[in-house]
Regions:
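A structural "hinge/loop" feature
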Residues: 43-62, 84-86, 111, 164-174, ...
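Detector for C-terminal structural segments
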Residues: 205, 209-210, 311-342, 353, ...
């Protein structure tokens, strides 16, 4: 949720985001790495705390990912590999995971990374005072207890089997921290989480910058790394710049070496600039969607939701708004997610005739003076929340306006409501889109996560209980399919279940997919070795070096 209302959600935080587009994963050209230097990167505002176990947002973990290592690593094919844990076993019933840890790794405060330390991290997840949304959603419902059965052997006992567990443990939200840091108290640890990673926090100025220095003793690089020791950079400065236009100007002037989420209007220019590069990678989880509140009329009728999907012509609306720079994503899961259903790509192609037939069947047969359909004298309309804060862009708004125009042609009144962050937080707190007066949909909602289990959290009764199913949908058959998938260790069986679930979610038209949530970084051509991780789509600076 890693909206994460995602947990992200709240990362998501359901704000219209400038993520998406080029699906290709690129890295900077590499020759012989050069050691030394300071890299300045513009990143999103991480808030007053950079401990990813507290709250848990994307901006937090961009920082934490440079400081903390994880028990396990997820490579670019979605395979889970050893990292701080060099091996593990899973009991036949899926209730006990036993991890054997590396014995040669220390935190940057000099204390050992051992079973007791990892136990302290997982036990901390259960502390409600920590208020981690990511951990609360994924781990609290399943984690029963932990036991250090040796100096470097940890046993994790679950309340119920959870097949995606290893994938979640690869996310930076559960990066392993020094228990000595925890002993300082929640607020102190917020300013300086201590890890085993390639960098350590030098200073943190909320709303301004985070300064990192190299961990000269680093010896635990993730699998597949070309570098085997300390990072190439001496230090990094992660600057907060709220205005994307100002961030782009900083890249052009040389004040910044890397900027996060450049404006869509700048993508073509960056690609043509011999001194700049653009790295793009689709994030797993969900694409950017219009999430629909299905508990109230008129969206409680599946025929109306399907008609909207057929009549909105998202493909054309997207092309017109982003000038062919953004790929359309048609399914409930991102194409970068394991068990993605490729057949989704053909769902809900523009078909106003089919939309008209569905609306006729649903009883919306009248017309008012403005040409909108009516039923019993009531106009067919729904109000969509969107925000012009943070990374929202002009093309995002144009996309919605284009859809609004197409829907009007079919007699559907899409009312665009520019809302505040307070309103979306109210929806999240209540666990319902319709909790905020007037709204029946959220534009720009996405949930980056590396497991298709996100469908269970967003669209089932489990999600209603956890307040992560903001659309309010409930279907016992879908509940059964996704609950079974979450406990199934057999990959072929779980894949079949997730594909079935995707088809059910698509058929029910619970959201309107738009474009993929994409990690996009623009950087100076002197920067080499920049990559994006697969688990959450976070920038990796460990192997970055700057040409002289």
């Amino acid at each position: 949720m890693h909206v994460r209302i995602s947990v992200a959600a709240l990362s998501c935080a359901a704000l219209l985001a400038a993520c998406g587009g080029n699906d290709s994963r690129t890295t900077s050209d590499a020759s012989v790495p050069v050691r030394g230097g300071t890299l300045t990167a513009v990143v999103p505002q991480p808030g007053p705390c950079i401990d990813p176990q507290v709250t848990g947002t994307d901006p937090q973990v961009i920082v934490a990912h440079q400081v903390l290592d994880n028990l396990v690593f997820e490579n670019n094919t979605g395979e889970v590999q050893p990292w701080l844990a060099k091996s593990w076993t899973i009991s036949p019933d899926g209730l006990v995971y036993t991890f054997t840890l590396r014995a040669d790794v220390k935190f940057t405060d000099g204390t050992p990374m051992n079973a007791a330390a990892v136990k302290a991290n997982l036990d901390r997840v259960l502390d409600p005072k920590i208020q981690s949304l990511a951990d609360a959603i994924y781990l609290v419902p399943i984690l029963k207890s932990t036991e250090a059965v040796g100096d470097f052997v940890l046993k994790v006992n679950l309340k119920k089997a959870y097949a995606p567990l290893l994938h979640f443990l690869a996310q930076a939200f559960i990066g392993i921290q020094s228990p000595a840091g925890f002993s300082r108290g929640r607020e102190a640890n917020c300013q300086d989480p201590i890890g085993t990673g390639p960098f350590k926090i030098q200073s943190f100025t909320p709303n301004a910058e985070v300064r990192l220095v190299r961990n000269d003793n680093y010896n635990s690089p993730p699998p597949g790394s070309q570098n085997t020791g300390a990072a190439y950079l001496d230090r990094m400065v992660l600057k907060v710049v709220s205005d994307p236009a100002v961030a782009y100007a900083a890249l052009n002037s040389g004040e910044a070496d890397v900027i996060h989420s450049p404006l869509p209007q700048s993508w073509k220019t960056i690609k043509k600039n011999a001194n700049q590069r653009l790295l793009s990678q689709v994030r797993p989880g969900t694409p950017n969607v219009i999430l629909l509140g299905v508990a109230k009329a008129p969206l409680d009728d599946v025929r109306v939701r399907q008609a909207i999907s057929y009549a909105g012509n998202v493909r054309a609306a997207l092309k017109g708004a982003f000038l062919d720079e953004m790929k359309y994503e048609a399914g409930p899961l991102s194409s970068a997610t394991s068990d993605y259903m490729a057949a989704s790509e053909n769902a809900y192609e523009y078909n106003p005739a089919k939309a008209a037939a569905l609306l006729d069947q649903a009883g919306w047969t009248g017309r008012d003076a403005n040409g909108y359909r009516t039923k019993n004298g009531v106009q067919l309309k729904f109000q969509l929340y969107y925000s012009l804060q943070a990374n929202a862009t002009a093309p995002d708004v144009t996309l919605l306006e284009n859809m609004q125009s197409y829907l009007k042609q079919s007699g559907i009144n899409l009312v665009l409501g520019q809302g505040s962050a307070t309103e979306v937080y109210s929806m999240i707190a209540a666990g319902s889109i319709t909790a905020v007066k007037g709204y029946s949909g959220i534009a720009g909602w996405y949930w980056p996560t590396n497991t298709p289990d996100v469908l269970r959290l967003m669209y089932t009764s489990d999600g209603l209980r956890a307040k992560t199913n903001l659309g309010g949908y409930s279907n016992p058959e879908l509940d059964s399919v996704l609950t079974k998938a979450a406990v199934t260790q057999d990959q072929q069986q779980s894949q079949a279940l997730y594909i079935k679930a995707q088809q059910m979610v698509s058929d029910a038209a619970l959201s309107i997919p738009m474009y993929p949530a994409t990690s996009r970084l623009a950087y100076n051509s002197k920067v080499h070795g920049l990559t994006v991780d697969h688990a959450l789509g976070l920038p990796n600076f460990y192997e970055v070096w700057i040409a002289k």
